[in-house]
Amino acid sequence: MPFVVVITGIPGVGKSTITKLALKKTRAKFRLVNFGDLMFEEAVNMGLVKHRDEMRKLDPLTQKELQLKVAQRIVEIARKEPVLLDTHATIRTPAGYLLGFPREVIEILNPNFIVIIEAAPSEILGRRLRDLKRDRDVETEEQIARHQDLNRAAAIAYAMHSNALIKIIENHEDKGLEEAVNELVKVLDLAVSEYA
């Protein structure tokens, strides 16, 4: 039976860093899969984009088709080994916010856990401004807060279609990265002990 833990958070929250560090500390033997990387691979192969940050500018129907293809690939991987799926619950597009997982995609993935990484909007804004490697859209602290609220709402909707448990982990500058990593390790170890 496929076993999937979804980890999500808006750009700049530290999700990918926390995930990579937690996998080094956990007893769990998850395979880290990045949903966006697989979508980007598919989109490049189809000649739709050349750079990852162009993904959010694709029309919603094209994005959904890519999501469905990628979800099937992830389930195939998860049949062989547990998957820690690094993704975004919602994606800000020029037309509005797109769910990272439409109903059909979440039903295919059927995750066991959904972990949301959050931080204060001011911290996220600061991290984005310091990250010169990415071509990120500029958002105000208010827009960042709204995006995080939408992520929580999306996680609840995902849980309704998958019976996943939801865990929120805060990654504040004063709290420390290590504490957020340790919280994720506890979730991953719990997942393995409960469902292995």
From Swiss-Prot:
Residues annotated for ATP binding in this entry: G9, I10, P11, G12, V13, G14, K15, S16, T17
Name assigned to this protein: Adenylate kinase
InterPro entries membership: Adenylate_kinase_AdkA, P-loop_NTPase
Family from the record: Belongs to the archaeal adenylate kinase family.
Taxonomic source organism: Thermococcus kodakarensis (strain ATCC BAA-918 / JCM 12380 / KOD1)
Gene Ontology MF terms: adenylate kinase activity; ATP binding
Reaction equations catalysed: AMP + ATP = 2 ADP
Lineage: Archaea, Methanobacteriati, Methanobacteriota, Thermococci, Thermococcales
Any one Pfam family match given in the protein's UniProt record, by short name: AAA_17
